[in-house]
Amino acid sequence: MAAPGSSYNLVETKPPLPAKLGPRGAAMAATKMAGTYDMVEPMKYLYVSVVKARDLPTMDITGALDPYVEVKLGNFKGVTKHLVKNPNPVWRQTFAFSLANLQSNQLEVIVKDKDTVLDDFVGRVVLDVSDIPECIPPDSPLAPQWYILTDAHGGRFHHGHTLGEIMLAVWIGTQADEAFPEAYHSGAHPLSAEGLASTRAKVYYSPKLIYLKVSVIAARDLIGAENSKDPPVKPTIAKIQMGGQIRRTRPGQPPANPVWNDEFMLVACEPFEDPLVVTVEEKVAAGSDEPIGRIIIPVAANAPRNDLAKSVASKWFNLSRGMTVEQAAADVTTGTKNREHSKTFASKIHLKMSLETAYHVLDESTHYASDLQTAAKKLRKSAIGVLEVGILGARSLGGNKNPYCVAKYGAKWVRTRTLLGTAAHAWNEQYTWDVFDLSTVITVAVFNNKNLDGHGDAKDEKIGKVRVRLATLESDRVYTHYYPLVALTPGGLKKTGELHLAVRFTCTAWANMLAQYGRPLLPKMHYTHPISVGQLNSLRFLAMQMVATRLGRAEPPLRREVVEYILDVESHMFSLRRSKANFNRTISLFSGALAAVKWFDGICKWKNPLTTSLVHVLFLILVCYPELILSTVFLYIFLIGVWNYRRRPRNPPHMDMALSHAEQAQPDELDEEFDTFPTSKPGDVVRMRYDRLRSVAGRVQTVVGDLAMQGERAQSLLSWRDPRATAMFITFSFIVAVVLYLTPFRVVAVLAGLYLLRHPRLRSKQPSAPFNFYKRLPAKGDMLL
């Protein structure tokens, strides 16, 4: 439950979901929704499927008819597209009207003729809403039937001819109906076709990303840029390019037959539209590289898939001279060769390429990744469960919002419909994902649709997002909460609303799920052939851009700002607020150890004589029976875990504003966090922030230096840097070795323990001799400039 007075905590709810009512309650819930929709509240809709019409009369003098259909229910109406000169039109459009906003008991389906000035009335069908049948899944879809068109007075003829017939399917269903995603909803009917497309619920899938490993080994018989017959005299490099990804080798020697042996990793995206362009360049001057040979390689045809980390054979490729990247790419696309540039030269380059499908291509932050599977399907593990998320609604969004939600887990993205013209934001849409690893996170974000005009020029407004880690969920339990939506802006922290979610994880393979806790988080290749952290971050950014570009090309597109917000593209940027939060997390991490040290110090100083006496007794028992030490420690851990079970977290974790230092952040710190890279601020602001960063870094530098000093003092014990101290230490070590050899271990342990726990009257207020000895040891601090 939410803590009193806190506006950023979870609020637990108890909506009447079939999944929470139990079998008996679900049977009495007056719904026949399929089991896949038991995580949302049933919402009834009136569906009107306009299929086609026949034998429509001509209304114009010209004898032409441009028919369209207008579906009216009170003040709501939907209009089909008009078809030119077609007396037997086919529309196949479905309209959905929410029964929660029912304004009339009569449904009118009117056929009209599109005209320049005033559209002509052709005929209509009037149905009583109370007579419309219910058809709720798992029932089969309702079959359409023919209805006779009549005029406004009920007549069936016009100038001696019938008004024709229209085929309709009219039924009352729920959001579980298969027609729901593609239906034209009542609030969206006035929009254009382009604007309407951006309001529908859709499912998207991320493109399949694979690492492409390219080894540039060597080249031979190169010809210089200035003379087409002589070898190059300046150093030569190889440039690797695929799409917007560019890599360069170091200069190779000798220039005519250079050897590089450089290895690069690129991100490839099926169906591999971008070829691999390898260009050998001569460094003719500083900052000026002239191409002396080029090869364009289609990735799909030339790069083998390496599923088992086997050694891939290298190949020699002929280099073409005088061909531009555009010409070569055109040849690859069309499959033809330009005769002028297709001459085979003696120059060759030695390459090794492979598609490393045994890796997982990271396209999101590793801290809240939703997918950890390999690119190769045959190496993937079987699913361990199912994640079901019901996006119920939102509240307190403020303003005139047209919100929609986007949820991302694994490769599957889902987008809810856009709610238009309503203050009661209720989606009640349910989605499912297969779960392969519990150490993953689902992200649900809310946006305000700014592109209802269909132009696509404006960016959709970010309202907030929610992350739920699956490992924190109990199996088969339905969590229903209002999650706070917050926006961090240069002006400060702002609560933008609350998102109502229902979440349930169902385990289908308990043994595999528990065994996963002992397996590596990432696929095996990430550990046997690791990629450096810097390179991995660079590849992750490229993968994010590829996903955003590919999803932006879908129809309707999932906009780039939406994808980048969910993938958290800017999470790697510097933030003083995040730095403070991470520092406090580190301090909090050691708070338990500090508390234990204080408690032990109190024991040694006899602040509580009874507790100290009990510790003496326990210590003597453990010395007499050392075989009980490990069992006592693990029994103590077990008892602590059992004791904490009563106070275990009952709600999933959410974004903590205090932990994030969002409320305490200063305006200038937030302004710096949202600054562009490189900075776009004036020089005096940048200078002030630089000085502040120097001050913080100076304190960090001092702490790091102190830590290094303590370690260096330990190293100097045996280094003879201080010959007297080392001689004393090794002499002491020899004496201790002899004493420990001659004295039983239990006697030594008892004496050492009693000395450590001695009464304060037997203690000196000055530092002990070992402490003083250690403080006097030399370190390397006096060797620094």
Model-derived segments and their meaning:
Residues 2-18, 34-36, 51-54, 68, ...:
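C2 and C2-like phospholipid-binding beta-sandwich domains
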Residues 6-46, 183-211, 363-386:
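Intrinsically disordered, low-complexity PEST-like regions enriched in Ser/Thr and acidic residues
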Residues 45-88, 211, 215-257, 284, ...:
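Calcium-regulated, polybasic anionic-phospholipid
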Residues 53-54, 217-222, 392-396, 508, ...:
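Hydrophobic lipid-interacting interfaces of membrane-associated proteins
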Residues 96-104, 265-274, 432-440:
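Short Pro-Gly-centered beta-turn/loop motif in secreted/extracellular proteins
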Residues 572-609, 649-737, 759-785:
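Multipass alpha-helical transmembrane domains of eukaryotic endomembrane proteins
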Residues 589-595, 606-645:
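Core alpha-helical transmembrane segments of integral membrane proteins
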Residues 619-634, 721, 735-753:
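Membrane-lumen (extracellular) interface motif
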